[in-house]
């Protein structure tokens, strides 16, 4: 009875959240997984006269992985993720290093670097659609127009309609611009959290600035770097609005699974759209679950 009085009020307090999360998160995940094993609302199966709720097992997944378009979208996603993660980590660390050294008007620089985060992905995509205008002729705008005015016309290119590789890579440019400030804030907080005694001890031992950062400071930032990697990784998997704003859903060079899911939903092929969603969920799980296990073990060891 005493134990109930101890944890009972707390359970009562969090029970609404548990119920809402259980229904709107895990319940809908289960519902989507169930739909992905049927031919629900697929025009092709309905035209064939079969039940739209007929169970077909992993048929939708087999169809997706047998589709060249879906395989291409997975390759595009891989290119996007690599460019996005590497770019955001590089510029985030670079800006954190510059601010960590102590510069005048540091608050102004922090605000400038963090400002892109205050802009929605779609609004950012609209602006970058103009900057990355693919027209290289008289109607060129944005960067292509700037190159022409600066006498650097040889740098003009078609950006996101150029090739299967560079098309999706160019989409990562605005995404890197938008998230680098956030990564900078993480690394800067990590630098500021390192005790000054460690720096002084390393300098007394004769360590140069390069050795100080390489052997003392950077190892202290490894947990933050891992967290940043996981955050950027899962954000790259669900990137959608900025792609739609820049290139739309019909550009084969910038198609990713999220865009494929949107297209299938518009075609009322809800079963295959749900299958794409579950595939993305598995990818996210492959990123997040090992990180949670690693973090939990570290907490137990400490």
What are these regions (language model features)?
Residues 1-5:
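Short, Lys/Arg-rich, polar N-terminal cytosolic tail immediately upstream
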Residues 6-302:
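A structural signal for multi-pass alpha-helical bundles of membrane permease subunits
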